[in-house]
Amino acid sequence: MLRPKIRVLIVDDSASVRQILTTILNADPDIEVMASAADPFAAARRLQDEIPDVIILDIEMPRMDGITFLRKIMAQRPIPVIICSTLTEERSDVMFEAFEAGAFDIVPKPRIDTTHALLEASARMCDAVKAAARARIRPRRPPRMVVEAKLTADAIMPPPVSGRARPTTERLVCIGVSTGGTEALRDVLECLPAKAPAILIVQHMPQGFTAAFAKRLDSLCEIEVREAQDGDVVVQGCAYIAPGGRHMLLQRTGQRYHIAIKDGPPVSRHRPSADVLFRSAAQYAGPNALGIIMTGMGDDGARGLLEMHKLGATTRAQDEESCVVFGMPKEAIALGGVDKVVPLAQIPREIMLWQDAKQPVPTV
């Protein structure tokens, strides 16, 4: 029995973009474009007659912007929405606003200047649509009230240097996450105390956005969150997010862990790649590492987590029920590299239980 095609509604004020996206999607045998609209009002009229499986939405449009329309969709009838806009490439705040409003994924507008770029964009868009059609779309959480911080003398001058450096860590956590990860990471990191172990994170995100993403998380969390830089010494109570477009590896010199940022080709179709991070953690931390694979499409991280598992690391995977896309965890479980499958809400507790229970193992 043939599976029904994934039905897509395209909302973009550019006729040429609508045509390019329609051509790309209709070329995939599993997808069909049911309709297109030049603005949110035309799209809303179409939605009264027919509900698509996935919506592809621009941001800058006449009469109503895409973010406002996205919020209305999520409030009335949640549908997986993929943002396709050049604005998200230029302004990181717009990207985070889209995710917070309920966007499933953000995909750059297709480039047609070269055949390679068009093929790459086509594959990325079709993959995103297929993942969105399988996704679990949940009602959005109300935004948190932000209380203005009480300032100290640090606002005027830095505190005196005590001569005592922050402790390095013998144990650390490595996390690989993709689609749905921006909100999932917030859920995890917000719950961790300042004494949490060091955490190295690969979140699939475009180049230029990870610094702003880290800064946003840092403002919400007790632990420090920063974009990783080459040579960073890994310390307790700090989370390091791999910079977009580059690989992050764990290395060790004597008793100190530090971070290496490397260029190179995409691994498992991604750069940064969770497989690269996990392999380096297996080599340099072994049983002193906790590897966690979370929501995301594809299989990045599955093989690397298995390597960590084989070299004595503790491993966890996010469960299907709490994943936006149960792709990366599913592949890791299938390979046999996962010790325990847990819901998203339990991951912070798993991290702290592991830190409190497991003694560091001497490593060479």
UniProtKB/Swiss-Prot annotation:
It catalyses: [protein]-L-glutamate 5-O-methyl ester + H2O = L-glutamyl-[protein] + methanol + H(+); L-glutaminyl-[protein] + H2O = L-glutamyl-[protein] + NH4(+). GO terms for biological process: chemotaxis. Residues 7-124 form the Response regulatory domain. Its main location: cytoplasm. Its EC number is 3.1.1.61, 3.5.1.44. It comes from the Bacteria. Coiled coil: none annotated. Contains a C-terminal catalytic domain, and an N-terminal region which modulates catalytic activity. Involved in chemotaxis. Part of a chemotaxis signal transduction system that modulates chemotaxis in response to various stimuli. Catalyzes the demethylation of specific methylglutamate residues introduced into the chemoreceptors (methyl-accepting chemotaxis proteins or MCP) by CheR. Also mediates the irreversible deamidation of specific glutamine residues to glutamic acid. This is Protein-glutamate methylesterase/protein-glutamine glutaminase 3.
